């Protein structure tokens, strides 16, 4: 799903138990004897069970060599330069950066000189974790926190480095600390799920290993290289997280 230069705003809903009850009763009365009403109600709650990420992209490339050459130019300016086989008729796409906030993504899109740039929405469905219970379910929830920790640190560090708010060495230290955090999460999850023969547990372990590998791949030869590399890893992190939650 791609969004082109159109500003949207998210909804921020605070629900109290009594309000929920009134809301359900009102909807129930309004949609009485209407099958569509209950379907729409289900869709309202379904929307709260997903997260959206926004990839700043340009598309329309048919030739992979040309796309990769353009991606290198993007990297040389601090962008992710991630080449993605496009969907929605966009051909091969080049990703500049990833965002978890639509307003932030829209602001950046508005400043891009290339008028063909757009926002590609990545929808991540929250897992119900029906396969897990008790201590295992708690361990899984704790392990899945790796993504938010990694995304936040990489995103903030790349932006701070780009704005000269931190030095290259400070950025390296932040990523080193992050790697230790993810490593600890991995170790704890492994110990709590040892002996459990489960495809889902294996998938989560692989996701944690992949996250550590992404952090190891961050380059520090220059500020521009570091910014680009971190943004590249963020894109991969989002896509891997999307795949993970679709499997667990």
Task: Give, region by region, the residue ranges found by the protein language model.
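Acidic/polar low-complexity segments and flexible, solvent-exposed patches
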Residues: 1-248
